[in-house]
């Protein structure tokens, strides 16, 4: 996702981001990328602020209804699902509040600092008993 421009509309839950983003995308004729980790799941429409089906016909949405709730999903798959948004020729609007998605989109997947990765690797090699003693 290097050198891909986007407009971002981010903020807390239930702050009206989705409605504003849809209106802007419709007026500007651009696509909309959902950066909400729950919107990727099909059939989970209640409480997720997904656009209604008739709204989805007006503009192109990415990152919505990507997998079934029984399937595993990770941020790399989300990045793959939204890539086509940049092929449309306009700058997409990224809307949502899932920090991991936003961080990986703006800083890349390899942006996690090595210190934490080294700590994780060290802890993964410890036994359950050692880990329990570690957190006491």
Which role fits each region the language model picked out?
Residues 1-136:
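Phosphate/pyrophosphate-binding catalytic cores of soluble transferases and nucleic-acid-acting enzymes
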